[in-house]
């Protein structure tokens, strides 16, 4: 996270949610000699969203991955010091992710962006269900205080679709089993 200058990270510890991380972890365990996992680490890096990457950011991320590999001893280090975590870094277990679902279908007006910090009950979006009618707008509030991790790219949504993800200060209000995108 420090090498990539991440604002947030989801922490996962081998469980049974069948997440991508677990699939990678199982491969590592299968290849470990005698079950010795000392010095081993599994991580997945999601390099931004579809709308967020430009050449400068891609280069910064590539350099960050290279620095991570240097730190793990995979690539020979250079003279630069290892980076530290950001002062505002958010690292929480995956169970702290609140998936905010759309209660209705319609057009989305976001009031927050990824990287914003929100308070419980704060309006994070509105869904327009019936344009021009006062009752045709549904306000969406944050279920708890936390960090906006992602939000939907498309501005149209169906009832029940993922609207945004918030890494909460506490475990998710709507606790769920399985991978985030089930």
Ranges and model annotations:
Residues 1-182:
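Structured catalytic-domain cores with a bias toward divalent-metal coordination
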């Amino acid at each position: 996270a420090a090498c990539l200058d991440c604002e947030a990270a989801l922490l996962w510890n081998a469980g049974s949610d069948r997440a991508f991380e677990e699939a990678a972890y199982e491969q590592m365990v299968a290849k470990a000699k005698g079950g010795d996992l000392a010095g081993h680490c599994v991580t997945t890096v999601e390099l931004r969203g579809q709308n967020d990457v430009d050449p400068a950011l891609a280069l910064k991320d590539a350099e960050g991955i290279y620095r991570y590999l240097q730190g793990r001893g995979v690539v020979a280090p250079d003279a630069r010091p290892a980076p530290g975590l950001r002062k505002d870094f958010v690292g929480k277990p995956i169970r702290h992710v609140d998936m905010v679902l759309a209660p209705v279908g319609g057009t989305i007006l976001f009031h927050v962006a990824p990287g914003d910090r929100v308070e419980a009950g704060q309006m994070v979006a509105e869904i327009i269900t019936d344009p021009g009618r006062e009752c045709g707008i549904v306000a969406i509030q944050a279920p708890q205080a936390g960090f906006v991790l992602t939000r939907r790219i498309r501005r149209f949504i169906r009832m029940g679709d993922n609207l945004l993800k918030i890494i909460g200060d506490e475990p998710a209000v709507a606790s769920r089993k399985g991978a985030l995108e089930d």
